[in-house]
From Swiss-Prot:
InterPro entries: Asp/Glu-ADT_sf_sub_c, GatC. It is an enzyme of class 6 (ligase). It comes from Picosynechococcus sp. (strain ATCC 27264 / PCC 7002 / PR-6). Belongs to the GatC family. It comes from the Bacteria. Keywords: ATP-binding, Ligase, Nucleotide-binding, Protein biosynthesis. The gene is gatC. The keyword Transit peptide does not apply. GO terms for molecular function: asparaginyl-tRNA synthase (glutamine-hydrolyzing) activity; ATP binding; glutaminyl-tRNA synthase (glutamine-hydrolyzing) activity. Allows the formation of correctly charged Asn-tRNA(Asn) or Gln-tRNA(Gln) through the transamidation of misacylated Asp-tRNA(Asn) or Glu-tRNA(Gln) in organisms which lack either or both of asparaginyl-tRNA or glutaminyl-tRNA synthetases. The reaction takes place in the presence of glutamine and ATP through an activated phospho-Asp-tRNA(Asn) or phospho-Glu-tRNA(Gln). GO terms for biological process: glutaminyl-tRNAGln biosynthesis via transamidation; regulation of translational fidelity; translation. This is Aspartyl/glutamyl-tRNA(Asn/Gln) amidotransferase subunit C. The keyword Cell membrane does not apply. Heterotrimer of A, B and C subunits.
Length: 97
């Protein structure tokens, strides 16, 4: 079981400021997490392939297709801000970047 001093030490190392309520709650929560990790370490994983994902990921989006849009002026007319034939967007990089 993790004690209060260990919680305070870990919080200090992680640069966390804990409230007294959090300090009282964390020993049991951290102990439960460590108990679970210990259970996991007892599992036989010799025949389990290493993976970075629990489930297979597949791309379910459609293939990109280039299409021409007939009325570019209609798009520009509905833009909140524009300059000539271009959309104006807020600057996202500062002067030094």
């Amino acid at each position: 079981m993790i004690d209060l001093e260990q919680v305070r030490k870990v919080a200090h190392l992680a640069r966390l400021e804990l409230t007294p309520e959090e300090e009282q709650r964390l020993p049991s929560q951290l102990s439960a997490i460590l108990d679970y990790v210990e259970q996991l370490s007892e599992l036989d994983t010799d025949n389990v392939e290493p993976t970075t994902r629990a489930i297979d990921v597949s791309n379910i989006t459609r293939t990109d297709e280039q299409k021409t849009f007939g009325d570019c002026q209609l798009l520009l007319d509905n833009a909140p801000d524009r300059e000539d034939d271009y959309f104006r967007v807020p600057k996202i990089l500062g002067e030094s970047e």
